[in-house]
C-alpha cells in the first residue's frame, strides 16, 4: 500500500503479545512471548503494561526491535458455555421466560406508579411500563433518541425512588459503560456507584469508582462486604461482570438494565440473567434490555448458512438463527402494543435532512424530530472563501461526491481518501473564517477498511494541521453509539465482491434494512457527506435510493 503511515489496528486497552524481532527469522513461534495491555498510544510511541511481573530485565533488551500482535482471551468462550449451563440450571420461571416455554409469560405489577413527573407523555408511558414489568421489559432505541441520556437515566431515578432497590447497569462495550457513568454523575439521587472492570479500560474520570479501588480502602472482609452491600448502583461491561459472578454470592439486584443488548448474543447474556444467589433465588429480579435490532448486531464469524437453526422445536420457540440476540428474539415474539416492549420515537441528534433517509426507509416514518437548536438553525458558515470545496460545505447539509477511480481488488481508494481530506480541510477553514472552535466533535470519518483509514490519515497529515490529529477515522462498528457534527462516509467499494460484503441486512415486515448503513448515516448531527463510485453502488438497490435521496436534498 502506498505511504508508510501505520494502519490503526490497535487501540487503547487492547490485549496484545510482543516479542523481540531483530531479524527476519524472529517470529512468535521462535521467540519468548510476553503478554501485555496497551496503556497509551501516540503516532510515534506505544506504551505496554505487562500482564505479569518481569524481574529479569535482560529478557527485554532496550536496543532490540519488537513485534506487537493482537492477543485474545479464550475465557470468553468458556464463559458462554458456562452461561448456557447456568440457563439450564436457572429457576423454572426464569428459564421458561428465556427459552420461550409454553405457559411461561411475563407479568406486571399495576400498582406501581411513577415518582416523578415528565414533560413527555411518551417518556412517562415507557418509564411506567419499565417500572411495572415484573420479569422483563424491552426498549427499542433508534439513533439519537436518548436511550442512555434520557431513558436509562430516568429509569435509574425511578428505581432509586423505591427504598433499598438495588440496580445493576450493564453494557457491551467500555465506551458505553463510560457513557453510563457520565449520566450517573448528573443524577442527584445517585450518591455513589461502583464500577466492575479494569483500570485501563475505564475512563480516568471514573476510575475512583472501580471495585478494585474501593477494595483498597477496606481494611478487612467485613468492611469490603459493607461497602458492596451499601452501594445501590453497580456498573459493568458484560465481560467484566461475567468474570466476577461471585458478586452474586454477596449481593442480589432487583433490576438489571442492559444497554446495547441487540449487540449481545444469547450465550453471552443468558448466564448473567440466570444467575442465582446462594439461597437459590434469582440473583437479578427482573431485566430491562435496551437496544435496536435495526442497528449493528453482534459480530459473528459464522456465515448465515452455518448459523441457521433447523430444529423445529427450537424454531417454534423463536430460535431461528444463532446470530440473533436475545433482545431481538424476545422482541419479535411479543405482540404489537405489548406492555413489555416500547420504542423511543423522538430523535434529538440529526438535522431533519439527515434523518429523513433512515426514518423513511428503515423506521417507516416512525421517528419525529425533537427540534433541538441545531436541528432547526441554519449552518453557521456565513463567511466563506472562493474554494469550491468551501462553498459546497458551507451551504449543503448533505451531499454525495461521486468518484471515478477504482483500485481493483484493493481495500483502499486513493480518490476517495484525497476528497475526504479536502472536505475536512475546507471544513476546518470555514471554522476559522467564522470564529468557531474546531475539535474532535466537529467531524468524524467512517470507512470500511483499515487500509482506507490509513490512506485518509496520510492525506490529512499532508496538511500539517495539528487539529487533524484528534479527528476520529474508524470503521462503522467503532462508531456505533457515537456522534459528530459532520460525518464523512467513504464507501471504498472498488468491485462487486466488496459491494456484496459491505451491507449487514435484516428484514422486518418485508422491509430490507441495511444495519451498517443505518449506523453510518445516523452518526451526523449537522452535516453528512458520502463518497463512492455511483456506477458500482447503484447496483445495490438501497445504495441507489440513497444516492438519489442525497442528490435531491442537495439540489434543493
Annotated model-derived regions:
Residues 148-162, 179, 183-185, 274-275:
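Walker A/P-loop NTP-binding motif
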Residues 169-172, 177, 181-182, 188-254, ...:
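Conserved helicase NTPase catalytic core signature
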Amino acid at each position: 500500500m502506498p505511504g508508510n503511515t501505520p494502519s490503526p489496528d490497535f487501540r487503547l486497552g487492547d490485549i496484545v503479545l510482543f516479542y523481540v524481532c531483530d531479524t527476519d527469522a524472529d517470529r512468535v513461534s521462535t521467540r519468548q512471548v510476553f503478554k501485555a495491555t496497551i496503556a497509551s498510544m501516540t503516532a510515534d510511541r506505544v506504551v505496554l503494561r505487562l500482564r505479569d511481573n518481569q524481574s529479569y530485565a535482560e529478557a527485554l533488551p532496550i536496543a532490540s526491535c519488537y513485534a506487537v500482535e493482537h492477543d485474545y482471551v479464550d475465557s470468553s468462550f468458556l464463559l458462554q458455555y458456562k452461561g448456557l449451563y447456568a440457563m439450564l440450571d436457572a429457576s423454572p420461571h426464569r428459564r421458561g421466560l428465556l427459552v420461550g416455554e409454553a405457559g411461561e409469560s411475563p407479568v406486571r405489577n399495576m400498582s406501581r406508579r411513577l415518582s416523578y413527573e415528565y414533560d413527555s407523555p411518551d417518556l412517562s408511558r415507557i418509564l411506567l411500563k419499565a417500572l411495572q414489568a415484573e420479569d422483563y421489559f424491552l426498549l427499542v432505541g433508534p439513533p439519537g433518541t436518548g436511550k442512555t441520556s434520557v431513558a436509562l437515566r430516568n429509569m435509574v431515578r425511578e428505581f432509586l425512588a423505591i427504598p433499598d432497590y438495588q440496580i445493576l447497569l450493564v453494557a457491551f462495550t467500555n465506551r458505553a459503560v463510560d457513557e453510563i457513568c457520565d449520566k450517573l454523575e448528573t443524577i442527584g439521587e445517585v450518591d455513589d456507584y461502583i464500577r466492575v472492570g479494569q483500570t485501563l479500560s475505564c475512563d480516568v474520570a471514573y476510575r475512583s469508582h472501580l471495585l478494585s479501588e474501593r477494595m483498597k480502602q477496606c481494611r478487612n472482609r467485613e468492611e469490603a462486604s459493607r461497602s458492596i452491600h451499601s452501594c445501590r448502583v453497580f456498573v459493568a461491561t458484560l465481560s467484566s461482570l461475567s468474570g466476577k459472578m461471585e458478586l452474586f454470592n454477596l449481593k442480589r439486584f432487583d433490576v438489571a438494565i442492559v444497554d446495547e443488548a441487540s449487540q449481545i448474543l444469547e450465550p453471552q447474556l443468558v448466564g448473567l440473567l440466570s444467575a442465582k444467589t446462594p439461597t437459590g433465588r434469582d440473583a437479578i429480579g427482573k431485566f430491562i434490555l435496551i437496544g435496536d435490532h435495526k442497528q449493528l448486531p453482534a459480530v459473528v464469524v459464522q456465515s448465515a448458512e452455518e448459523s441457521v437453526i433447523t430444529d423445529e422445536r427450537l424454531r417454534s420457540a423463536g430460535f431461528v438463527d444463532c446470530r440473533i440476540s436475545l433482545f431481538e428474539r424476545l422482541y419479535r415474539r411479543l405482540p404489537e402494543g405489548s406492555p413489555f416492549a416500547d420504542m423511543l420515537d423522538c430523535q434529538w441528534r440529526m438535522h431533519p435532512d439527515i434523518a429523513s433517509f433512515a426514518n423513511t426507509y428503515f423506521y417507516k416514518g416512525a421517528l419525529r424530530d425533537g427540534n433541538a437548536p441545531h436541528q432547526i438553525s441554519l449552518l453557521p458558515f456565513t463567511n466563506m472563501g472562493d474554494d469550491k470545496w468551501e462553498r459546497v460545505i458551507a451551504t449543503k447539509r448533505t451531499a454525495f461526491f461521486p468518484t471515478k477511480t477504482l483500485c481493483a481488488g484493493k481495500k483502499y481508494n486513493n480518490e476517495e481518501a484525497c476528497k475526504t481530506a479536502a472536505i475536512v480541510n475546507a471544513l476546518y477553514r470555514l471554522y476559522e473564517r467564522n470564529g468557531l472552535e474546531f475539535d474532535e466533535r466537529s467531524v468524524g470519518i467512517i470507512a470500511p477498511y483499515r487500509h482506507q483509514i490509513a490512506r485518509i490519515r496520510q492525506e490529512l497529515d499532508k496538511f500539517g494541521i495539528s487539529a487533524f490529529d484528534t479527528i476520529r477515522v474508524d470503521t462503522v462498528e467503532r462508531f456505533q453509539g457515537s456522534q459528530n457534527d459532520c460525518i464523512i462516509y467513504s464507501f471504498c467499494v472498488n468491485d462487486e465482491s466488496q459491494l456484496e460484503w459491505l451491507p449487514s441486512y435484516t428484514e422486518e415486515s418485508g422491509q430490507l434494512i441495511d444495519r451498517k448503513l443505518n449506523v453510518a448515516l445516523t452518526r451526523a448531527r449537522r452535516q453528512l457527506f458520502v463518497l463512492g463510485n455511483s456506477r458500482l453502488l447503484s447496483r445495490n438497490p438501497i445504495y441507489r435510493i440513497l444516492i438519489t435521496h442525497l442528490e435531491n436534498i442537495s439540489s434543493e
